[in-house]
């Protein structure tokens, strides 16, 4: 208890000291940002009055779409859903709803599963209900230790995903690369595992990671586009090589794709999707921010590894071209092995075809 009070006191001091420099880390947007997490679904949907007119909201079929409580094994583990658990936003051609499930002590090292039902006009019919598991920033062994890694793998297997996507920053030391890759290789999905690398991975142990990924048949997306095929149809997953080196990687790998393709762009940092034109991308997945790692009740993070400040902290956001971005808090930590009001999470995305 005393330790938590000390952390909260330190956080309060950091917050006060950061007020003077707040202008340095906050970017003025050309138009109001629209966040899914600001729109709660209940008997009515409350919408900010200043929403940009380019967003068209359709409330007709957004009710009663919460996932049913998990049965069987998960029920015994007392996994609980938050209340209110669902948030939604509709953009022209896209509908997104989210559900958060807190897993409690059922899985060490992971606090919650955040599921996004992502409905888009370019999703092929064969990909209706397609399940994507997305994790990032394991930083093994930081806060994530052996038991936590085992439980993370068990949780991912329990999700029965069709594909596993990983956003980079696998390790906190080269000696940890083989065990973390061996563990992730236990997660078998119909379409395999695809990953990009993070700044930690480029700074150290790059060759070790590439070698281990090849050994286990994982797909490394370094400015590369791969095709996911199902039922005679296809979608594309593209990955960014070192998004911090824009001199070499400042052209998006999605530029060669067609506007009516359904394209997922995987990048370690969300900043890349604002710094670089990511044309033809329909959904961007990113990590790196850790959700702030240490925040003031989840509302404000004194330190954010982004030159856009709080803008791309966590959750569903949009870049200036109104492309949706899902930014995960990740699993592990950097610098200090502590999280405060920035829960470690696994993200699930379920694809649906928008037909109306």
Residue ranges and their predicted role:
Residues 93-94, 100-105, 117-119, 181-246, ...:
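Extended active-site neighborhood of metal-dependent phosphoesterases/phosphodiesterases
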Residues 185, 270-350, 354-356:
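Conserved beta-sheet core of the metallophosphoesterase superfamily
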Residues 8-14:
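Bacterial N-terminal signal peptides
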Residues 111, 120-133, 218-219, 226-239, ...:
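Beta-strand-turn-beta hairpins that frame and shape the catalytic cleft
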Residues 135-136, 163-169, 192-199, 221-224, ...:
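Active-site neighborhood of phospho(di)ester-bond hydrolases with catalytic His/Asp-centered motifs
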């Amino acid at each position: 208890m005393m330790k938590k009070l000390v952390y909260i006191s330190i956080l309060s001091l950091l917050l006060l000291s950061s007020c003077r420099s707040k202008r340095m880390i906050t970017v003025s947007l050309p138009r109001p940002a629209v966040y899914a997490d600001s729109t709660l679904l209940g008997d009515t949907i409350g919408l900010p009055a200043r929403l940009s007119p380019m967003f068209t909201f359709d409330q007709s079929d957004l009710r009663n779409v919460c996932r049913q409580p998990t049965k069987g094994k998960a029920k015994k583990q007392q996994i609980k859903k938050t209340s209110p658990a669902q948030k939604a936003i509709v953009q022209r051609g896209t509908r997104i709803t989210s559900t958060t499930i807190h897993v409690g002590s059922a899985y060490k090292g992971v606090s919650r599963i955040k599921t996004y039902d992502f409905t888009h006009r370019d999703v092929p019919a064969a990909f209706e209900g397609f399940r994507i598991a997305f994790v990032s920033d394991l930083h093994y062994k930081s806060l994530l230790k052996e038991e936590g890694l085992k439980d993370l793998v068990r949780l991912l297997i329990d999700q029965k995903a069709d594909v596993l996507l990983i956003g980079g920053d696998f390790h906190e030391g080269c000696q940890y690369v083989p065990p973390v890759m061996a563990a992730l290789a236990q997660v078998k999905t119909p379409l395999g595992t695809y990953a990009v690398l993070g700044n930690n991975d480029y700074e150290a142990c790059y060759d070790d990671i590439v070698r281990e990924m090849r050994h286990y048949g994982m797909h490394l997306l370094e400015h590369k586009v791969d095709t996911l095929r199902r039922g005679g149809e296809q979608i594309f997953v593209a990955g960014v090589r070192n998004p911090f080196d824009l001199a070499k990687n400042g052209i998006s790998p999605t530029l060669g794709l067609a506007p009516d393709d359904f394209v997922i762009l995987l990048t370690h940092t969300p900043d890349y999707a604002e710094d670089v034109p990511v044309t033809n991308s329909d959904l961007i997945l990113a990590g790196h921010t850790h959700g702030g790692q240490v925040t003031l009740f989840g509302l404000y993070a004194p330190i954010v590894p982004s030159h856009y400040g709080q803008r791309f902290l966590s959750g569903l956001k949009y870049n200036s071209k109104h492309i949706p971005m899902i930014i995960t808090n990740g699993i592990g930590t950097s610098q200090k092995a502590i999280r405060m009001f920035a829960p470690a999470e696994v993200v699930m995305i379920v694809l649906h075809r928008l037909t109306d």
